[in-house]
Amino acid sequence: MNLTRIAQPGRLRLVIAAVIAAIAGLLISLSQVASARTAEAAAAGDGPKPSIVLVHGAWADTSSWDGVIKRLQADGYTVYAPSNRLRGLPYDSAYLADFLHSISGPIVLVGHSYGGAVITNAATGDPQVKALVYVDAFAPAQGQTLAQLLASSPGSCAVPASLTVVPFPGAPSGVGDAYIKQSVFPSCMANGLPPTKAHVLAVTQLPIATIALTQKSGVPAWKTIPSWAVVGTTDHAIPLALQLAMAYRAHADITRVHAPHLSMISNPGTVTNVILQAVLATS
C-alpha cells in the first residue's frame, strides 16, 4: 500500500486552506487600506485645498495668529495673514478685497474682532470666498456701526475711559488713533493669559482710527456665504450676548470656548479646528 498517496489528499486540503486564509487576510488588508484612503479623501474634500486668510482686529497684529498659522501649515494649508490697516471700515475692506483678488483658488476667510467687520464687507460678492469664520468678532448688518453694536449690549471694556487717542497726520477733524491703555489691556483684552504675555501684547498693539467705529457697514457677506463663529465666553471687549446675537443672525455654526477676547492666542487649537470644519463643510 502506498501510504504517501493516501496522505496527499489531506495535505492538499491543508495547502488549499492555507492559501484561502492567506488570500482572505490579503483582501482584509487591502480593504482596510482602501477604507483609510477613502476616509482621507473625504476629509480632504473633492476640490482643491483652499487658502486660509487670517485678518486681525484692532489692538492686535498679525502675530496674534501665530499659533493658528503653525497648525494650519502643519496640515498643508497655504496661509495668509495680511496686515489690517485699521484706517476705517470702507478703506480696510477695500484693501482686503484687493488682497483676496491676488489669491488663486478658493478661500476660507477668518476675521478677529474688528477684522470680522472687515471680512463681512470685503467678501461680499466674491465667489472665491467659500466660508467665513468669525473669532470673537463683529458681524454687522447693513447700515450698522460698531459703536451702535457695542451700545446695544453694554459691558464692553473698550470704552472712552480705557482709550488713549493720539492724533496722526492727515486725520479728519476729531479723528485719532485709539490705543487701549496699557494698564487696562490685560484685563480688557487678555484676561486669563499669562501676565507677561498680556503686557507684551499691550505694548505691541496696533491702534485703530476712531472713525472706524462710526462708519456704517455695507451689504454683509454672511448673507450668502456659510459662516462659523468662535465665541469667547469670558470676552470683556465684545460682550458674549452681542457675539451670540450676531452669530445667530448670520446663521453661523457656533463654537463656545472658555477664552478672553484673544481666543486665537489662548486657544489656538480650538480656533484651528473650527477653521478646518469650515474647510471640510465647503470643500
Which residues does each PLM region occupy?
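Active-site catalytic motif of lipid deacylating hydrolases and related acyltransferases
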Residues: 44-103
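Conserved alpha/beta-hydrolase catalytic His-Asp/Glu region
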Residues: 174-207, 211-220
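C-terminal region of N-terminal signal peptides and the immediate post-cleavage residues
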Residues: 26-46, 283
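Conserved serine/cysteine hydrolase catalytic core
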Residues: 203-250, 255-268
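Post-His helix in hydrolase/transferase enzymes
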Residues: 265-281
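Flexible "cap/lid" loop of the alpha/beta hydrolase fold
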Residues: 128-129, 133-173, 209-211, 238, ...
